[in-house]
Design a protein with these regions (language model features):
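Generic detector of low-complexity/intrinsically disordered segments
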Residues: 15-18, 24, 218, 288, ...
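Short, solvent-exposed secondary-structure boundary motifs
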Residues: 569, 575-576, 844-852, 894
Length: 931
């Protein structure tokens, strides 16, 4: 149960906690009041964002997905997400608090479904990829204990810590350190020069707020085991949320044999986090430990000028060739009330710090690169009013030359991409992608990155582009390697400085010889099994099978991927790029005739039956990761615009003869549609169930022609993240994605919404984003949460018992669950660990004592409409036969069927699942093909 920290009086007065005991009219008034307050939070949020965007102008685009997710997960009471609760939950999971006590027949059957073989609990999911895509990476380190110089550690922003034992080989696989790390946001990694077996990993990404951190993790055995240090229990103090959420950098200095650990802590980024209680504001600053991280002391000299008790938000820490400590800063969440950004400090003794540069731009983010041969020489890259600036010093910061000097002696790189401004090679994203590093052997050679990578051989006086993110916008004629956009890290191999690694939004890239970049293969991807891809969603092709698979998945900055074919030796599927940029939601026809895929906002496309690709809608309205649905029966596409209005396109089975229009579910009251689900039980028209971000459920009938909408009364307030159906249109499962002590995130109705049952049970306080009910055993339900897959075997109980069924996937955000009944395949899309499936290979897929499948036979299969079932009539008198289509809807039923008795169907071509029942007992299930 969620821990209630309020007093009993407060609980009694709480609308969410108390409304269920009110009279229907009083409850309705309470819910309306609660929704009104939530809409006010949304309005406040929108106003805050407009202010932030105005401050940045068009120079720095907002991180739209994180803004969207912030709204969808906020506590309705406080107006802010409560990520820090996941830290306590992780501790509970580690202690085994939510370990399953029984297997679910819904999931992969490894040792049988009778509950006696507990292995089914431990490995229900199979990793499917992508195998060579990667994802956003800010932390890379060559293992100092590997004399070959081949072993590398790297951290995904939301995919945990990984190791590759031979980075020089394109076939060498990355291995996750542990599923424990899977929801850990890695921002930095370093080792102790006095004891190279000791590593420190900083967590949390303040640049986007995409993933909250959990302090610092330490290992003393080269990465085999880890302990958590420098963690402050999160708590509120007024509007300030305290905690070490963002450890941007960790470095270790050898001071005459004493290991001094420096940790750079930042508050949340103002350009992304908003209305969030000033997350980590008071903990920002530079910290130092001399006892292995047992204790840390804040260095008070690095404080904002407005408040000596408020530390600067630290961006980077570097140890110079003379053992001096350099520190750069970044913007503070407190904005003008804390002039944090644009500063560089230096200390020769690790105690007394001198400010050696101040851009007097409080919002500036500063990255540094120090010479390994000249302790007084450094290069700096920062966001500024230009909007980016490069600086250089050769005297320890006493004087600087800069690209904004009246007569500059150093210059900015200019990208060959005509879509990137000549004065901003970060393309307005200096808050996000920014890195500069000199060569460790020759410090006149400098590397820098924004969107693409550049090299200077004359101390930043001039630059040459050495990578390109695409062949668009004039880039095709540039001889350079194709390297993913958005650069975050540049690292040299200490054993061979000609070898380099680059970290970006596409993962890890490797250069074997940095003396020659005049080649399309000078820099190559090293993402083999580096599966840290962040998927917004994924959809199975309903007519495929695990041995001839196809599904589409849309990823953050890695486009839409197509998984296809049979499993490889490692169980991954072959993956190809289906569409670039940010891939969003996808859909399939129930007969596999067309595919729907998406870019951001209302940019939706279709692969038609003739194999050609067409645009369904191409407008920049709607959500960044926009909501869509397809009625596979009526072949109609729907997507949200704003409020309760939607796009509609009919005729999806045609080749570009689509009829497009706009429909509405009524007048919104400051809220919007957050989920569209198509009822599989209405077959002659479209019936939609629409969820809103205030907790409303709207039923829209005749959505494909002349819509009529009815609001279904609900007892919940929050963002409706998923709507699924049980055995009929009256059985509706709903999830909400908000944090909140009094939030209930799972609901069920079996009477079409006349009454609702709270199915929260013992579920911890965390967002729930997806849900699915076992069609053959409704007591089993799984959900996709912020901490992996959870499930229950007693959903029908008043208070279900939930457990984590997420081994392999780990504690990773699950954004969508899809299901293919014909093969009993589940697909889980994760935000940080790629795509996973679970297929129950036991055709019974239920716990029973009936005969095995050898006692049954369906023929002919495939069929053209007539089916026969053969079985031993001595064991079973007459059977009741049902057929279900790919959506799980029952489409055929016949009772009292004898062995070898003909059953004539008029079903369309496709895959179906046949279920044979002896009374109330399911005795046989099998896929059937009608053609």
């Amino acid at each position: 149960m969620k821990k209630h920290i309020f007093t009993s009086i407060t609980i009694c007065l709480s609308i969410l906690g108390y409304s269920q005991y009110l009279s229907p009219k009083s409850q309705d008034r309470a819910i309306k009041k609660e929704r009104k307050e939530l809409v006010k939070q949304y309005a406040k949020l929108e106003k805050s964002m407009k202010s932030i965007h105005a401050q940045k102008g068009n120079a720095i685009p907002p991180n739209a997905y994180n803004e969207q997710d912030f709204q969808e997960t906020m506590n309705p009471k406080t107006g802010a997400p409560e990520f820090y609760k996941l830290l306590d939950l992780k501790a509970d999971l580690d202690a085994g608090k939510f370990k399953p006590k029984e297997p679910l027949s819904l999931l992969t059957n490894i040792g049988g479904n009778n509950g006696s073989d507990k292995s089914v609990i431990n490995q229900p999911w199979t990793e499917r990829g992508p195998y060579r895509v990667g994802g956003r990476t800010r932390a890379i380190m060559f293992d100092p204990n590997d004399q070959s110089g081949k072993r590398v550690f790297a951290g995904g922003v939301s995919g945990g810590l990984w190791r590759n034992d031979d980075i020089t080989s394109s076939v060498s696989e990355w291995q996750p350190i542990s599923t424990f790390w899977s929801n850990t946001s890695i921002s930095s990694i370093s080792y102790d020069p006095n004891n190279p077996m000791t590593f420190y990993v900083g967590t949390g990404e303040c640049e986007t707020g995409d993933a909250i951190g959990s302090g610092i993790w330490k290992t003393t055995d080269g990465g085999a085991t880890w302990t958590n240090i420098f963690v402050l229990p999160p708590y509120y103090n007024g509007t300030t949320r305290n905690g070490n959420f963002y450890i941007n950098d960790v470095k270790v200095r050898n001071n005459n044999g004493v290991s001094e650990i420096y940790a750079g802590v930042s508050g949340g980024n103002i350009s992304i986090n908003f209305n969030d209680g000033f997350s980590g504001l008071m903990q920002a600053g530079l910290y130092k430990s001399t006892d292995g991280g047992a204790t840390f002391n804040k260095i008070s000299a690095l404080s904002v000028p407005e408040n000596p008790n408020l530390g600067l938000s630290v961006q980077q820490i570097e140890i110079g060739a003379d053992n001096a400590v350099w520190v750069s800063t970044r913007t503070s969440r407190y904005s003008s009330g804390a002039s944090s950004g644009g500063k560089i400090y230096r200390s020769t003794d690790g105690t007394t710090f001198t400010k050696i540069y101040d851009a007097n731009i409080s919002g500036a983010r500063v990255k540094m690169g120090l010479s390994k041969t000249n302790p007084l020489k450094a290069y700096v890259l920062m966001s500024a009013s230009e909007p980016v600036r490069i600086l250089k010093t050769v005297n320890g910061g006493a004087t600087w030359v800069a690209t904004n000097d009246a007569s500059p002696t150093i210059t900015l790189p200019q990208d060959a991409d005509t879509g990137i401004p000549t004065n901003d090679f970060t393309r307005g994203q200096a808050f996000y992608d920014l890195v500069i590093t000199p060569d460790p052997v020759n410090d006149e050679i400098v590397y820098t990155g924004g969107i693409d990578l550049f090299k200077s051989t004359d101390g930043a006086a001039s630059w040459k582009q050495i990578s390109k993110w695409s062949n668009n916008n004039n880039l095709a004629s540039l001889t350079a390697s194709l390297v993913h956009a958005d650069q975050h890290a540049i690292v040299f191999n200490p054993k061979n400085p000609q070898q380099m690694l680059f970290g970006n939004d596409g993962g890890i890239f490797y250069a074997a010889n940095n003396t020659n970049f005049n080649s399309s293969v000078a820099i190559l991807a090293r993402n083999t099994r580096y599966n840290v891809t962040q998927f917004y969603g994924a959809t199975l092709n309903p007519v495929k099978t695990p041995n001839d698979e196809e599904f589409l998945a849309g990823a953050q900055d890695n486009g839409t991927s197509r998984f296809a074919g049979g499993p490889l030796a490692n169980n991954f599927y072959n993956v190809s790029s289906y569409y670039g940029g940010d891939g969003c939601h996808t859909e399939f026809d129930d007969q596999g005739l067309y595919k729907v895929y998406s870019y951001v906002y209302n940019n939706h496309f279709i692969t038609a039956p003739n194999g050609s690709n067409y645009s369904l809608f191409a407008v920049n309205n709607g959500l960044f990761v926009n909501i869509l649905a397809v009625d596979r029966n009526m072949d109609v596409f729907y997507s949200t615009i704003s409020g309760y209005t939607m796009n509609r396109a009919t005729g999806l089975k045609t080749n570009n003869a689509y009829v497009k229009s706009t429909i509405s579910a009524g007048t919104a009251s400051g809220d919007r549609i957050s989920k569209i689900s198509v009822s599989p039980y209405t077959t002659t028209s479209s019936t939609l169930f629409l969820g809103t971000n205030s907790g409303k459920i709207i039923k829209m009938i005749n959505a494909d022609t002349t819509p009529v909408s009815t609001v279904i009364a609900t007892p919940f307030v929050g963002n409706v993240s998923d709507i699924k159906f049980g055995a009929s249109e009256n059985e509706i499962l709903v999830t909400l994605s908000n944090y909140g002590e009094t939030m209930k995130n799972v609901y069920f109705t079996n009477d079409g919404g006349a009454t609702w049952q709270n199915k929260e049970g013992n579920l911890p306080d965390m967002p729930v984003r997806a849900i699915f009910m076992n069609p053959t055993k409704p007591s089993e339900v799984i959900i996709g949460t912020e901490m992996g897959i959870w499930g229950t075997a007693n959903f029908a109980a008043a208070s279900p018992t939930w457990a984590q069924y997420s081994d392999g996937i780990g504690n990773t955000r699950v954004t969508k669950i899809d299901y293919r009944p014909s093969t009993k395949t589940l697909l889980a899309a994760t935000y940080g660990r790629g795509a996973w499936t679970s297929t129950n290979t036991n055709v019974l897929a239920v716990q029973n004592t009936a005969s095995s499948k050898e006692n049954f036979k369906i023929y002919p299969n495939p069929s053209r409409g007539s089916l026969y079932i053969k079985y031993e009539e001595s064991k079973f008198r007459k059977l009741n036969i049902s057929l279900f289509d790919a959506s799980g809807k029952k489409v055929f039923a016949r009772n009292n069927v004898g062995s070898d008795e003909e059953m004539i169907t008029t079903l369309p071509k496709g895959f179906y699942i046949l279920k044979a029942e002896n009374g109330t007992e399911t005795v046989y299930t099998t896929p059937v093909i009608i053609r």
